[in-house]
A protein has these predicted regions:
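Membrane-embedded multi-pass helical conduit in multi-pass membrane proteins
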Residues: 2-41, 313-393
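Cell-envelope/extracellular polymer assembly enzymes that use nucleotide-activated donors
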Residues: 67-72, 98, 248
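Short, acidic, metal-binding catalytic loop of nucleotide-sugar glycosyltransferases
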Residues: 85-97
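Long helical/loop segments within the catalytic core of UDP-sugar-dependent glycosyltransferases
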Residues: 121-142, 170-235, 239-240, 279, ...
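Short aromatic/hydrophobic "clamp" motif used to bind/position activated sugar donors
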Residues: 153
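Acidic donor-binding/catalytic loop of UDP-sugar-dependent glycosyltransferases
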Residues: 156-172
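Acidic donor-binding loop at a coil-to-helix junction in glycosyltransferase catalytic cores
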Residues: 243-249
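Catalytic donor-sugar/metal-binding loop of nucleotide-sugar-dependent glycosyltransferases
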Residues: 251-268
Length: 402
């Protein structure tokens, strides 16, 4: 039987709408659960040079239980002033933590923390470069200087910082490793990049929190990852990949029999300051995952399937409705189920971003609603840009931070 163009169109769009529906259901269910449990209520608002916190819900003051907590910021020196600002915030918490900065030999900036300088001639056995090289050297340095099972390392990028209660929780957390949820600091510097990052907030509140609480880090990210020092030293960071070190480390932690959990505290990140930086950042993430897929597949094939499904279908939440519009005007041929799926997908897509707005600045809610589709196109364009203009595999894109 020969299919007509309209029938083929109906089949394809119905498939796209149906494939996104499980994501929509999961996202909605998990975010509603967050509202009901208020499990991410430690959602401090970042303000300029300090963090304003609600009354603490984590009663953990035993800083002398034998456990040591250190914070490590890895930087290439491009954002030295930002790192200094983040270190001053961490110091203001007045906690018995040690602060370290892993930096390159060419970085002559003197940071207000203990410095670990990666020698210019240092080479990883698996030829890891850039951040992976620095992290791997750092793990060896910590081992050499006696940091072991009693020490927990909180890793930060050179634009991220965690709250005081996040660090307090580490002193008693019952896992070998873990991670919290993302929030924004310095939002609004670039409107579309800020609104685009609302997706990351909701992603963390739903899938990150859920999978981490189950001990399966299926959506891990680099900011705020906490690892016991001896575990990190055993696994290392020398993967020889372009990036995706956060995902790989999380999978290897579980693969090697260690535990991974959810830390009920915020990690503050800064949105990119321009469209150019936003696209360069997303391109780096996309290609890091694509190039690392064969490596990750050997560790956890389920993660690869999940990531591919999310990347391939995640964009269709907002286009499913538009894909079906021609059929509505030409001839109403969709089943009631597909119509219901399409409506639910669209509502969920708006709700997903509104949750991020709720956790950042409620006054932006109407603006987010009006700009929902332009922002979605802004984000979706990163995939097209990445495929058309792949990065230089021997060069690591660096963006300006604040």
């Amino acid at each position: 039987m020969t299919l007509t163009i309209s029938t083929t169109y109906i089949i394809i769009t119905s498939a796209i709408i149906t494939l996104y529906f499980p994501i929509a259901v999961a996202q909605t269910t998990l975010l509603i659960a967050q509202f009901r449990r208020n499990s991410d209520r430690v959602h401090s608002k970042f303000r300029k040079s300090h963090i304003e916190m609600p009354p603490p819900i984590l009663v953990q003051k035993n800083y002398h239980n034998g456990r040591k907590v250190i914070v490590v910021i890895t930087t290439n020196g491009a954002n030295a002033e930002v790192v200094d600002k983040l270190l001053s915030i961490l110091k203001s918490y007045m906690l018995p933590i040690r602060l370290f900065v892993i930096k390159e030999a060419y970085d002559k900036h003197a940071y207000p923390a203990e410095e670990i300088v990666v020698p210019a001639d240092y080479n990883c056995p698996n030829k890891s470069r850039a951040k992976l090289r620095a992290l791997h050297y750092g793990s060896l340095w910590f081992k050499e200087h006696g940091f072991g099972k009693e020490t927990y390392i909180c890793h930060l990028d050179d634009d991220s910082v965690v709250s005081r209660e996040y660090l307090e929780y580490i002193y008693s957390m019952p896992y070998d490793s873990g991670q919290g949820h993302i929030r924004l600091r310095e939002p609004g510097k670039h409107l579309f990049s800020t609104l685009g990052d609302m997706w990351r907030i909701s992603e963390c509140a739903s899938f990150c929190a859920y999978f981490n609480s189950k001990g399966k880090p299926m959506t891990a990210h680099g900011e705020g990852m906490v690892i016991r020092a001896d575990v990190e030293e055993k696994i290392g960071w020398d993967y020889g990949t372009y990036g995706a070190e956060d995902v790989i480390m999380a999978q290897l932690i579980v693969k090697n029999g260690y535990t991974f959990g959810y830390i009920p505290g915020p990690i503050f990140i800064a949105p990119p300051l321009s469209a150019r930086d936003f696209y360069k950042q997303r391109r780096r993430w996309i290609w890091a995952m694509l190039w690392a897929t064969p490596f990750i597949e050997k560790i956890n094939r389920k993660y690869v399937y999940w990531a591919l499904y999310r990347y391939a279908i995640g964009w269709s939440g907002f286009v499913g409705f538009f894909l079906s519009l021609p059929a509505y005007f030409i001839h109403f041929q969709y089943s009631y189920a597909i119509i219901a799926f399409s409506m639910f997908n669209t509502i969920n897509y708006f709700f997903f971003y509104q949750y991020g707005i709720f956790k950042t600045n409620k006054r932006w809610s109407l603006l987010m609603f009006i700009l929902q589709y332009p922002v979605s196109l802004y984000e979706g364009g990163t995939m097209i840009y990445s495929l058309l203009f792949p990065p230089n595999k021997m060069k690591y894109d660096v963006i300006k931070k604040i």
